[in-house]
From Swiss-Prot:
Biological processes annotated in GO: pantothenate biosynthetic process
GO cellular component: cytoplasm
Family indicated by similarity: Belongs to the PanB family.
A Pfam family matched in the record: Pantoate_transf
GO MF term set: 3-methyl-2-oxobutanoate hydroxymethyltransferase activity; magnesium ion binding
Location of this chain's protein in the cell: Cytoplasm
Complexes and interactors: Homodecamer; pentamer of dimers.
Organism: Caldicellulosiruptor bescii (strain ATCC BAA-1888 / DSM 6725 / KCTC 15123 / Z-1320) (Anaerocellum thermophilum)
Name listed for the protein in its UniProt record: 3-methyl-2-oxobutanoate hydroxymethyltransferase
Binding-site residues for Mg(2+), renumbered to this chain: 45, 84, 115
Catalytic residues as annotated in Swiss-Prot or TrEMBL: 182
Reaction(s) the record says it catalyses: 3-methyl-2-oxobutanoate + (6R)-5,10-methylene-5,6,7,8-tetrahydrofolate + H2O = 2-dehydropantoate + (6S)-5,6,7,8-tetrahydrofolate
Co-factor requirement: Mg(2+)
Amino acid sequence: MNKVTTKTLFEKKQKGEKITMITAYDYTFAKIFDSCSVDILLVGDSLGMVILGYDSTIPVTMDDMEHHVRAVSRGAKYSMVVADMPFLSYHTTIEEAVKNAGRLIRAGAYAVKMEGCDDVYDKIEAVIKAQIPVMGHLGLTPQSVNIFGGYDLRAKEEAEAKKLVEDAKKLEKAGVFAIVLEKVPSHVAKEVQRSLNVPVIGIGAGPYCDGQVLVCYDMLGMYEDFKPKFVKRYAEVGNMIKDAVTRYIEEVKKGEFPGKEHSY
């Protein structure tokens, strides 16, 4: 099976085939997801919350991202690896944006994801001109949570919805190969999807997008601190882990483990 590329994703949109995307933060999970033929593995700055225990993505550094990109890329043979550019890694200067994007590509990412439009448009253009594929991100942009004042639904009002569609078109013109839409009304996402040639991948953006993305710890039932409406839990792995560890503790205390079959 050939590795997923930007061309693969464009062809999927043209054929009406849905794109699958899931976060991954380490080699083991990446290898499992890759074996399932997930199209895109996103090394998300959400690792700040689900891996590092922060209450937002803002404290995540380039060193954090580079470390996890290296791990995920080793486990991905089929899936495209996309890396989030963390807070303030591309907001100051064009030179800094290109340099940091290059670090993530050297670490093993195929592409980077950058949040926003107007405030960082020149940086997005510059990274693309440096021959680095960029995925856009509009709607709820978690790195701007302190500006928004929370994780509320975006583009509820007509003016904001219209601006969202305009921004998506601007990002496409800049050269992004796909756009993530987060936590916007379904009808707004539908309008964006119909307006663009590049794929639109939704998270909390309804069924009309060209693909969907979820945080792996959310959809596997492993993260209890944050339970948004848009997450479907496909398993309760957290409970399975608790049960397994509890059994292990009990067997060790009772002297039942290790048994003969586990001894040399």
